[in-house]
Amino acid sequence: MPLVKAPKKAEPIWKEWDAKAQKAGLRHSVYSVNGDEYTGEWLNNLRHGKGTYMWKRRKSIYEGDWKCGERSGFGTYSVQDSNTGEYIKVYSGYWDNDKKHGYGTHFYSAKEYYEGEWKCGKRCGWGRMYFANGDIYEGEWLEDKHSGQGMLCLANENRYEGSWKDGKKHGPGKFYYLNKGQLYEGVWVEDIPKCGTMVDFGRTEAPYPTKYPLPEVKVADPEGVLKEAQQPLFGEHE
């Protein structure tokens, strides 16, 4: 008796529609219910590859790399100027899991920006910050604050070189008062100089030198005096 194959069971029509709706590869613009728009590549129904996303309510745009539906890789985020309608660059650099991560530049205003390393959306690692008032900080960051070794150059060309903690001068450091020709070297605690020495430094070239030079003062055991003064501030092991 000949074998008769059973007829192939027809797939429900909803499965056919669902398969057609699945997004993979390059697609033209796809609109969300809230008005957002995405144009670019997809994988397994997620934004993946190169693409551009426009937020309608935020009036902002991201152009760059995507991975599994999140910004990941290199990309640029811009916001629309309410007066001109043009898009102004806010951040250009690397992303991971939808957050700034790696090396990138963030523009806080036309005259204030940061270029350097990021971690989980915060400035972390090495970076340089240009402030609107003309000050420049270059050095280490942690949790969006100066932490570690760094140099702050003020707009008047005075500068601090040394240790930082939580955005404040903390630990050993040097402050160059180039406008009056003096140098302070010592220990700082939460932005306040606690123990150190002040000497003349480049006084003849300073634009506003002090009226009289600092007299030279010496102690028999300067290292011992400094250590004794620092101990209450940092303890025995610092």
From Swiss-Prot:
It holds the Pfam family MORN. The keyword Isomerase does not apply. MORN repeats lie at residues 38-60, 62-84, 91-113, 114-136, 137-159, 160-182, 184-205. Keywords: Cytoplasmic vesicle, Repeat. PANTHER family: MORN REPEAT-CONTAINING PROTEIN 3. Assembles a suppression complex (suppresome) by tethering SIRT1 and MDM2 to regulate composite modifications of p53/TP53. Confers both deacetylation-mediated functional inactivation, by SIRT1, and ubiquitination-dependent degradation, by MDM2, of p53/TP53, promoting a proliferative and cell survival behaviors. May play a role in the regulation of spermatogenesis. This is MORN repeat-containing protein 3. It comes from Xenopus laevis.
